[in-house]
Design a protein with these regions (language model features):
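N-terminal cap/leader regions of alpha/beta-hydrolase-fold enzymes
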Residues: 1-251
Length: 251
């Protein structure tokens, strides 16, 4: 397994004073995450993608996660954190033992707290080395990127692709500019967006919001042909580059 035990994937061009911490999707630190880091280097930025599943890679494989997510796909975010509802959903789908173990871990509150702790630690490590730091995340990682902005006031900015917004009561602690990108066919995540946007605007926060029509959750990931949208992904990356130049600068 390529990422078994690896702490992170990093690209640090010589002379870079700005770095983007990249948080992976629910699939783990896979080739697509590494490709995002390579794209960032072409824009002139250093990058570091922590392996947030370190120590759990044998269970949290993309295959196991795919089967696990299929078992709970019809549940809301809140229902997925209800152990009884998750168990009932997996029973209906006759999920495998590995899928059950994977979903049990992914929605375990202590494990999720550990993901945030790992994300924050990764940001701290990078901030000790680089003058300017931005977070960028996709899916699960997008939510972590936004949560980091509520916890670390030294961030230059934070970027989320279809991530779950943080609780509205945490918005007051955000000081960094936010770029929030969504797919319009993403009902579960999008239910939380209006209250999040309202809280950001009411708080006078720096928010750039973009929702792409006729796209699904994960549209930026070109390794997932069932959801990838080339046009939206290309434009979203152009906006990401513009936002990084505005908030982190070219280094």
């Amino acid at each position: 397994m390529a990422n078994q035990g690896r702490k992170s994937f990093s690209i640090k061009p010589k002379g870079s004073s700005g770095c983007v911490v990249v948080f992976h999707e629910v699939w783990g630190l896979v080739e697509h995450t590494e490709d995002v880091c390579k794209r960032l280097s072409k824009l002139g930025f250093a990058s570091s993608a922590p392996n947030l599943y370190r120590g759990h890679e044998r269970l949290l494989t993309p295959g196991n996660i795919q089967r696990a997510m299929e078992g709970v796909w019809d549940l809301s975010l809140e229902e997925r954190r209800d152990k009884t509802k998750v168990t009932q959903a997996l029973d209906r789908k006759r999920a495998s033992r590995e899928a059950r173990e994977a979903v049990s871990l992914l929605y375990n509150p202590a494990f999720r707290d550990g993901l945030l702790a790992g994300a924050l630690a990764a940001v701290d490590d990078v901030q000790a080395e680089f003058e300017g730091v931005t977070t960028l995340g996709f899916c699960m990682g997008g939510g972590l990127s936004l949560k980091c902005a509520t916890k670390n006031q030294k961030l230059k900015s934070a970027i989320s692709f279809y991530g779950e917004p943080p609780p509205t009561e945490d918005v007051a602690r955000i000081s960094a500019p936010i770029l929030d990108i969504h797919a319009n066919q993403d009902e579960i995540i999008n239910k939380k967006v209006p209250s999040w946007v309202e809280a950001m605007l009411d708080g006078g926060k720096d928010l750039t919001l973009k929702t792409y029509p006729r796209t699904k959750h994960g549209f930026f990931n070109d390794t997932r042909k069932e959801v990838y949208d080339r046009t939206a992904a290309t434009e979203a990356w152009d906006i990401t580059g513009w936002f990084l130049e505005r908030t982190l600068g070219r280094h």
